[in-house]
């Protein structure tokens, strides 16, 4: 039987299904489809023309089986190789009550039979604006059974009437719908999944036509939970050798869908009759193998896509060995630090003083020693003399530092087992070097740590980094909204999980506007009264109808002069993977109309024991203030 099944887009191989409207002999058809290389079959569970009557006699009591026996296939085949399809005559949102009632009963009958068979997924059409009753019937079905099927909503990328050739150009058309053109089908989907309360079991099967909408519409779809892409054979062109191919625009869309690991469903008859039907599938395989290779960041992040992690608290907690190990593997970060220290040493020590002027360097938060090694390499590269202090509060990491010193560094490095804020330094430093930044710059309390340590920096001393800025951007992602919603803990407030940030490799999301700077900190901080509390207001113009689920956070830092590190997408340091972005969720999704502005307020607050963020949306509508008094999330000092 087929090598793989529904839900298994494993490795680089394309997972694909064949869509058929009529299957006279199910076992034979399944065998033939598997032979062509497909992994599953989409087919009606009942005969598509067999309309059942649920209210009127005598048809209501018609004898005989309603559909064919489940014994035609093994349980395993039903479970893995068949995706059910709803009969095309079922219209639960019909304005005619008799049709509506009959459709409801027939739909439940088909869904229940699909659950009885244990189908992995069921395809349901979304092909009009009003799908409210469809949503109700499906939601009730999901909440009553113990089945685990996924429900794939078949949504066209462009509404069928937008492709009509019979509309006279520039003539007024009768528009009854609120949204026209490219917006339409996304609004059908958005309203439907909102009615279904963002159920994790409802996903998109996106039907791709010959005409593609504009890029921003496609971008928005890619923030949705797309599980399948339906490709009609009619959209394929023919190359010189008679094989089916896709246009360049379609190829670009396929590449982006492959990144989301969607499964492809081929529908329609063979339009390239001299070629085997499997040539459509072979072309998709060809595209998969010839897509741009993943970069170093994507390779490192594999498996972490949209996986929520709690931000580290290295001040309050001692990190584990593996955590240090991951950070030390970053090839870019430490070469940038080395370059910054190198430039700083050259600026501070003129050539004629290179043998007499010994610069005192203090690595604050030395961890297992990567910055100490970067400093030693920089001194060698600059041909300047340095004296090093490696200060680390984690007693476990100090063991590693002391071994380094014993085996490699010698008397050039002094290892100090102490919190930098409490250490009484024997002398003042020319340069302090630290790597205390989190995904949102200051969220691992770099400002508080460095402010507490700057009393042992000389008046003309330098801090590396010298400055850092956090950035925020509004995003839409039902995947991430659902992931956050699922983080509910039984002893906490039911919405506490929406009042804390998460470190996450953003993947299945749509950024609604470019990131804007939020908070900036500079070191050394020479203000007479140091206050690291902050408040900012950011306004983001939005050019599409969409829904806001939260904010992505990034940072940029100036290590020294023109040497920088960044995880802001526009300026991301190539190949650097030490930091994933941070996510600040909001409790309730907010619908945003094209042309509106999203206004967010962000606070950085603190008391003597902890630091926390608070945030609120104030336009286009007001949200609650999230995390007041740090009730759900704080960072311990």
UniProtKB/Swiss-Prot annotation:
Binding site for a protein: 327, 435, 444
One Pfam match: PRMT5
Binding site for S-adenosyl-L-methionine: 324, 333-334, 392, 419-420
Modified positions (N-acetylalanine) in chain numbering: 2
Region (TIM barrel) location: 13-292
Keywords, alphabetical: Acetylation, Biological rhythms, Chromatin regulator, Cytoplasm, Golgi apparatus, Methyltransferase, Nucleus, Repressor, S-adenosyl-L-methionine, Transcription, Transcription regulation, Transferase
Record Gene3D superfamilies: Divalent-metal-dependent TIM barrel enzymes, Hnrnp arginine n-methyltransferase1, Vaccinia Virus protein VP39
Record's subcellular location: Cytoplasm; Nucleus; Golgi apparatus
Residue ranges of the region described as Dimerization: 488-494
Regulation: Activity is increased by EGF, HGF, FGF1 or FGF2 treatments, and slightly decreased by NGF treatment.
GO BP terms, alphabetized: circadian regulation of gene expression; DNA-templated transcription termination; endothelial cell activation; Golgi ribbon formation; peptidyl-arginine methylation; regulation of DNA-templated transcription; spliceosomal snRNP assembly
GO CC annotations on file: cytosol; Golgi apparatus; methylosome; nucleus
Residues the record marks as site: Critical for specifying symmetric addition of methyl groups: 327
Region (Beta barrel): 465-637
Highest taxon above the source species: Eukaryota
Reactions mediated catalytically: L-arginyl-[protein] + 2 S-adenosyl-L-methionine = N(omega),N(omega)'-dimethyl-L-arginyl-[protein] + 2 S-adenosyl-L-homocysteine + 2 H(+)
SUPFAM superfamilies noted in UniProt: S-adenosyl-L-methionine-dependent methyltransferases (SSF53335)
Primary role: Arginine methyltransferase that can both catalyze the formation of omega-N monomethylarginine (MMA) and symmetrical dimethylarginine (sDMA), with a preference for the formation of MMA. Specifically mediates the symmetrical dimethylation of arginine residues in the small nuclear ribonucleoproteins Sm D1 (SNRPD1) and Sm D3 (SNRPD3); such methylation being required for the assembly and biogenesis of snRNP core particles. Methylates SUPT5H and may regulate its transcriptional elongation properties. May methylate the N-terminal region of MBD2.
Family, per entry: Belongs to the class I-like SAM-binding methyltransferase superfamily. Protein arginine N-methyltransferase family.
Subunit structure: Forms, at least, homodimers and homotetramers. Component of the methylosome complex, composed of PRMT5, WDR77 and CLNS1A. Found in a complex composed of PRMT5, WDR77 and RIOK1. RIOK1 and CLNS1A associate with PRMT5 in a mutually exclusive fashion, which allows the recruitment of distinct methylation substrates, such as nucleolin/NCL and Sm proteins, respectively. Interacts with PRDM1. Identified in a complex composed of methylosome and PRMT1 and ERH. Interacts with EGFR; methylates EGFR and stimulates EGFR-mediated ERK activation. Interacts with HOXA9. Interacts with SRGAP2.
Annotated protein name in UniProt: Protein arginine N-methyltransferase 5
Encoding gene per record: PRMT5
